[in-house]
């Protein structure tokens, strides 16, 4: 009588080991990778010197001219980001995230080391290239956590990881402002602190667990799932009983596994090698399917167009502030403005969750109105020669964009699997960067028009105004079509009775 009991316990233990290899136990396994990733995100974004980058480059430390900074150095970041985005997107999935996160940390270290010690135009252009690598590899940070936690934890861990970057950026901005305005530290000292923080982030990244799967190239084979497990689209496992029932001592496993003493132990199948051609074929089919949806296409178009303009305004806002009030002649509050705009934007984003609106009906009109407000904010920032008006307009600009991009993200992600959401996110960002590259090449780059900073912002305001006109026309057409559809059912009975 003891033998079956021992065999039963061995079978239960073997099943438990198999589940531990192929599944993720949300209550026990999610905390460590989430905490490590949040720590990485916090320190990687804790960069007190970033709001003061333009004054630092124009100041005595680097002694560069405005034309060199705006028209020859900053465009390198845009070109690098675009060039690297798609290869990094695929490499992130193929290498399973952690190596790319380490690459991001290393790129940040190189960027801030060069910011401290590199001199000359060419060296700073190389610096911008490494910063482009760091920006392109951000996708690994935001995707990693979905491969090491249970599906039911996605919402919670997403909020934790995004909050970590938000808090890190805000703390860095406030710290930089205090050290400059109150303590009187030099901008060089702020870069030393930034280098230290990104080095800490790089060290933390080494302790991240290596994921066993990814969205596209490294799916968990379905034969490994066992115990009533079904493979879902993101490679995780869904069982027909609650996950909590399996946790305490794995008691539930023993009753679900048929025992056969004559059968040898079952060997776990090896993970199949990724079929690259199949992956690209699936990506292409998903691309066609996703963008054939009119609502998704509408939100994606706004995402790409507005993100292009947002990047341009944020990248060159410090240059406009420097023009309105040179940092050599007065105190500057760039760090405080970045912190305030981030906090108010986060508060507004939180409030979005409580908005009750039929986005299918009024979404395009909302995009029109908010794009028009963004255009007005950028125009005021450019034309009113007051630094405080510039600061206030910038805060309004960032709040509106953060709210709308949150709504767009939700509208796009609501009915997509994780793979398709990652694909749409990557495609939208790539289109935004392609447009930004074109805009930079024509308006900013010294090889193009090489316009002054105030003329650039006038063009950006006109750009957002054009976006608002597009969505106004599209919104009117959509509302008219919807009204006609609502009238058709009521008119058909009248026609039949007559």
Swiss-Prot record:
Site positions (Essential for pyridoxine transport): 104-105, 109, 111-112, 186, 191
Expression triggers: Induced in a TP53/p53-dependent manner upon DNA damage.
Tissue: Expressed in liver. Expressed in cochlear hair cells and duodenum (at protein level). Detected in pancreatic acinar cells (at protein level). Also expressed strongly in pancreatic islet cells. Expressed in the testis.
Molecular-function annotations in GO: thiamine transmembrane transporter activity
Cytoplasmic-facing ranges: 1-28, 93-105, 150-164, 208-295, 356-360, 408-423, 478-498
One cellular-component annotation, GO: plasma membrane
GO biological process: cell differentiation; pyridoxine transport; spermatogenesis; thiamine diphosphate biosynthetic process; thiamine transmembrane transport; thiamine transport
Membrane-spanning residues: 29-46, 72-92, 106-126, 129-149, 165-185, 187-207, 296-316, 335-355, 361-381, 387-407, 424-444, 457-477
Membrane topology: Multi-pass membrane protein
N-acetylmethionine: modified positions: 1
Mutant phenotype after disruption: Males are infertile with reduced testis size and aspermia. Spermatogenesis fails at the pachytene spermatid stage with apoptosis of germ cells. When fed on a thiamine-free diet, animals develop additional phenotypes including diabetes mellitus, profound hearing loss, and defective hematopoiesis. Pancreatic morphology appears to be normal although insulin secretion is significantly impaired. Erythroid precursors in the bone marrow are almost completely absent leading to loss of reticulocytes in the peripheral blood.
Glycosylation sites: 63
Residue ranges annotated as Extracellular topological domain: 47-71, 127-128, 186, 317-334, 382-386, 445-456
PTM-bearing positions, type Phosphoserine: 222
Substrates-to-products reaction catalysed: thiamine(out) + H(+)(in) = thiamine(in) + H(+)(out); pyridoxine(out) + n H(+)(out) = pyridoxine(in) + n H(+)(in)
Keywords assigned: Acetylation, Cell membrane, Differentiation, Glycoprotein, Membrane, Phosphoprotein, Spermatogenesis, Transmembrane, Transmembrane helix, Transport
Record's subcellular location: Cell membrane
Tagged with keyword Manganese: no
Family membership: Belongs to the reduced folate carrier (RFC) transporter (TC 2.A.48) family.
Record text on subunit structure and interactions: Interacts with TSPAN1; this interaction increases the stability of SLC19A2. Interacts with TMEM63B.
Job of this protein: High-affinity transporter for the intake of thiamine. Essential for spermatogenesis. Mediates H(+)-dependent pyridoxine transport.
Name of the protein: Thiamine transporter 1
Record lineage: Eukaryota, Metazoa, Chordata, Craniata, Vertebrata
